[in-house]
Every structure is written in C-alpha cells, then in structure tokens.
Amino acid sequence: MSRFARLRSPLWWLAGVALLLGQVAHAAPLSIGQLMAALAKNPQGAATFTEKKFIAILEQPIESSGELLFIAPARLEKRTLKPKPETMVLDGDILTLERGRRKHVLQLKDYPEVAAMIESIRATLAGDRKALERVYHLALDGGNERWTLVLTPLDPRVGAVIARIRMEGLKDVVHSVEILQADGDRSLMTIEKRAPQQ
C-alpha cells in the first residue's frame, strides 16, 4: 500500500475543513479576494458534518458523521462519532490518528506531497491567496447568493492524489465539499456550522 493510500482518509477531511468554517459577508458578485479576506477574519470555528465516501470497489457509499474544529493558525480536528469513534488532529506539522486503542503519529516532513496540500489548506484558512495559488489553480463561479470554488492542483505530485476539490456555498455558508481523487473515488461532505458556545 502506498503512502498516499494510507493517508487517504485524512486528506479527504482536511480539504473539506478548509472553507467550511468561514463566512462571506460581502455583496455579490463575489471575488476570490473577498472570499480570502472573509476567511482571514475567522480565528476559529466549529461545525458538524455528514460525509459519504464513494469507492469504486464498494457497491454502497461509506457514511460517517461527527464534529470539525479549526483553531488558527495551524490546528484542525475531525472527530468522527458514527459509525465508529475516530479522531484525526493536525497540529503544526504533526498528524495524529486515533482509532480505538490505536494511535498513529505522522510527521508531515516525511510526506512532502501531502504536506504541500495541507499547507494549501492552511493558506485557505488564513486567507493567504498567494500561498494557495502556488499550489492550486483557483476558479470561483457565481456570486454571494450562490457560489462554487474549485481548487485544481498545479503540482503533478499533488495531482496524483487529488484531482480537484469543489466547494459550494449559499450566501455566507459553505454547505458542501466534494473531493475527487485521481483514481476516481470521491467524497461528499455536507456541513452545518455550529453556533459558538456561550
């Protein structure tokens, strides 16, 4: 099994969390610059998710649900609650995976292609358009009422894993993130932003 195959699940959620926690408060038409500026104003956020993974060798999609959390500048968490508890935490350049009693800690420096993609996700969260465009081609369609952002990898090494990331939003809410892998498998995550706790 390749290094990319072992990290397939973490890659799916990292891309999804990149935009799910941002809000867009600008009038239509919406530009990439406006979207990035809005994301840069959000130091943290939380959401619930439902995810379906469509894998070629399986007749039915794999479904899961749980919670997502982002804390600027570099911490991302995905806590799957159903069907089985699982936790994935990215903190700095360390990715920690916990499934039952098993815990795996990975150094991103050992996975340069994966690190490049994750840094692009962080750049999105930070609203750093220049850093994002060093790795992806960005295409934004629509306006503030309904918009779609598509990220296409520029680096062939990243493109060997992820074909594209498609994010759709309605007004100031990102409601879906679809990730198409180079091998044809894909995931679709629907997100509901959680209100801040009092």
Spell out what each predicted region is.
Residues 63-65, 84, 91, 159-164:
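Short, surface-exposed coil-to-beta transition loops
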Residues 12-22:
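Bacterial N-terminal signal peptides
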Residues 2-14:
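Bacterial N-terminal signal peptides that target proteins for export
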Residues 60-66, 185:
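Amphipathic hydrophobic-ligand
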Residues 28-55, 59-61, 99-154, 161:
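Flexible, processing/modification-adjacent segments and terminal tails
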Residues 129-136, 142-198:
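Gly/Pro-enriched, hydrophobic low-complexity segments
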Residues 67-119, 187, 193:
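An acidic-aromatic
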Residues 49, 76-79, 95-97, 149-151, ...:
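Short hydrophobic/aromatic-rich beta-strand segments that constitute the beta-sheet cores
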